[in-house]
């Protein structure tokens, strides 16, 4: 059965290897990082945490080495501790180089964006001028349409007034026509009545004349032919 001290040494070595691999992976992420700075800052924070954990485990391993009873095992563990420290220093050097590479890439990217920003600024200025000109043209067109609609409205009002006047004239003419129709109808009635009266007068005259002639004939008859 393994001694507790040997188990602790084994765990320390496993943790040291794990943290070393995690640090290397984060350093590679920093090399590949192209920004922004906030992402680089976040990666560096993670690297610092891993270095702290790695350093703590190396110190634990070193303490365990010093507590070994056998000198040979002690020297072997101290050699492992020294190798881990060298590897940690190498990782720190790689970390600094990766930061320099990343910051240089971010600076170059920012310069390129500034240059593109100048072109973009000129393009936006040109676009604004074009939009302003287009807006002015549209405004003039809308004003022209507004004037045209105003003229059409005025013409419509004049046409409406003319229509109202014509309607009033037609109504007046209709009233006059109704009045004339009444007058004509009254005249027709009077003429009909007059014609009837004239016929009656003629008939009376004819009857009076016939009566007169009959009377004359009767008198002549009595004078000339008394025996009849």
Swiss-Prot record:
Main location: endoplasmic reticulum
The organism's place on the tree of life at top rank: Eukaryota
PTM remark: Polyubiquitinated. 'Lys-63'-linked polyubiquitination by RNF185 increases the interaction with the autophagy receptor SQSTM1. Undergoes 'Lys-29'- and 'Lys-63'-linked polyubiquitination by RNF186 that may regulate BNIP1 localization to the mitochondrion.
InterPro entries, per database record: Sec20, Sec20_C
Cytoplasmic side: 1-199
Keywords from the UniProt entry: Apoptosis, Coiled coil, Endoplasmic reticulum, ER-Golgi transport, Membrane, Mitochondrion, Protein transport, Transmembrane, Transmembrane helix, Transport, Ubl conjugation
Bilayer-spanning residue ranges: 200-220
Membrane topology: Single-pass type IV membrane protein
Function of the protein: As part of a SNARE complex may be involved in endoplasmic reticulum membranes fusion and be required for the maintenance of endoplasmic reticulum organization. Also plays a role in apoptosis. It is for instance required for endoplasmic reticulum stress-induced apoptosis. As a substrate of RNF185 interacting with SQSTM1, might also be involved in mitochondrial autophagy.
Record PANTHER family: BNIP1-RELATED, VESICLE TRANSPORT PROTEIN SEC20
Protein name, UniProt field: Vesicle transport protein SEC20
Organism per entry: Rattus norvegicus (Rat)
């Amino acid at each position: 059965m393994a001694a507790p001290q040997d188990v602790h040494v084994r765990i320390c070595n496993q943790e040291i290897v794990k943290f070393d691999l995690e640090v290397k992976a984060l350093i590679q992420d920093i090399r590949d990082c192209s920004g922004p700075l906030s992402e680089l800052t976040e990666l560096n924070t993670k690297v610092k945490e891993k270095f702290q954990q790695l350093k703590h485990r190396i110190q634990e391993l070193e303490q365990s080495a010093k507590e070994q009873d056998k000198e040979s095992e002690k020297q072997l563990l101290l050699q492992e501790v020294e190798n881990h420290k060298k590897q940690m220093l190498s990782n720190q050097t790689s970390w600094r180089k990766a930061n320099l590479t990343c910051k240089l890439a971010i600076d170059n990217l920012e310069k390129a964006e500034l240059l593109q920003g100048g072109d973009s600024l000129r393009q936006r200025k040109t676009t604004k001028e074009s939009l302003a000109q287009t807006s002015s043209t549209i405004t003039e067109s809308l004003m022209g349409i507004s004037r045209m609609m105003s003229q059409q409205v005025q013409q419509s009002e004049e046409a409406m007034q003319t229509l109202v006047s014509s309607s009033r004239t037609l109504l007046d003419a209709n009233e006059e026509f109704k009045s004339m129709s009444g007058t004509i109808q009254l005249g027709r009635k009077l003429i009909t009545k007059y014609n009837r009266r004239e016929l009656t007068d003629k008939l009376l005259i004819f009857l009076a004349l016939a009566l007169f002639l009959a009377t004359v004939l009767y008198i002549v008859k009595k004078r000339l032919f008394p025996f009849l």
